[in-house]
Amino acid sequence: MLNIGCHLSSSKGFKNMGENALKIGANTFQFFTRNPRGSKAKDIDENDVKEFLELAKENKFCKILAHAPYTLNACSADERNREFAIEIMADDLKRMEYIPNNLYNFHPGSHVKQGTEVGIEYISSALNSILKKDQTTKVLLETMSGKGTEVGRNFEEIAEIIKRVELKEHVGVCLDTCHIHDAGYDIVNELDEVLEEFDSMIGLDKLYAIHLNDSKNPFESHKDRHETIGNGYIGLDALTNIINHPKLCHLPFFLETPNELEGYKREIELLKSAYKK
């Protein structure tokens, strides 16, 4: 079975997201934990959560993926911004325990000319501050395109962050196809080699989710602009190879393409028809 979903609005709660996922043929979904700008999160509706968990179990959902606000920067040059990122992520992880054993994804951040080493140290320190031994949520570092001073533009940087985390069992990676293509990893022509490099640097056992996106920009452009499936520089054939790859096919895939629900439904149908497992 292809485990696939897309990014959904959380404005009407978990059950509504689950119902919308089912309407488009998905068995998982991604959502923002709060407004993308990082404002106060809505109170948890425990009855809504209970109904969602029942729906998810009944329909055999795989793990869902929470996404931290884009504006968080755990390696900012401004100490207040770093503290804010830690505060929000810690609160998010506390709230995630209402839906245990799922995934939480965040962008590592930008070092803003402090240097990559400083950025890596701040990010790993932030993770060491927020991770708890008894948490059930896996925290995922997202691979980035290398725009500006982003940290996480290559596998080495992700690996170094994880190396410095004390509770390594609670961290992993979310691989974004658009990002790594734009960062210079040739997933179109050399997918096996890219996965071998990931495995040697980080370990495929640390890969827990994939953002499945096409790219509006050419290879190694460091731009990060997502395109609908099959209409970008990555292309349908390469994305089909990814969902069918024996080292990846068991993972949950999350679409973040520029789409509404009907567009996501068409993409999910297209990818399901191309899935061979």
UniProtKB/Swiss-Prot annotation:
UniProt cross-references to InterPro entries, sorted A to Z: AP_endonuc_2 (IPR001719), AP_endonuc_F2_Zn_BS (IPR018246), Xyl_isomerase-like_sf (IPR036237), Xyl_isomerase-like_TIM-brl (IPR013022)
Keywords in alphabetical order: DNA damage, DNA repair, Endonuclease, Hydrolase, Metal-binding, Nuclease, Zinc
Binding-site residues for Zn(2+) 1, renumbered to this chain: 67, 107, 142
Pfam families: AP_endonuc_2
Positions with a binding annotation for Zn(2+) 3: 179, 224, 226
Cofactor note: Binds 3 Zn(2+) ions.
Chain residues that bind Zn(2+) 2: 142, 176, 211, 256
Cofactors, names only: Zn(2+)
Catalytic reaction equation(s): Endonucleolytic cleavage to 5'-phosphooligonucleotide end-products
Family matches, as Gene3D superfamilies: Divalent-metal-dependent TIM barrel enzymes (3.20.20.150)
EC number: 3.1.21.2
GO molecular function, one term: phosphoric diester hydrolase activity
Entry keyword annotation includes Nuclease: yes
Keyword set includes Disulfide bond: no
GO biological process, one term: base-excision repair
Similarity annotation: Belongs to the AP endonuclease 2 family.
PANTHER family: APURINIC-APYRIMIDINIC ENDONUCLEASE, ENDONUCLEASE IV ENDODEOXYRIBONUCLEASE IV
Function according to Swiss-Prot or TrEMBL: Endonuclease IV plays a role in DNA repair. It cleaves phosphodiester bonds at apurinic or apyrimidinic (AP) sites, generating a 3'-hydroxyl group and a 5'-terminal sugar phosphate.
Full protein name: Probable endonuclease 4
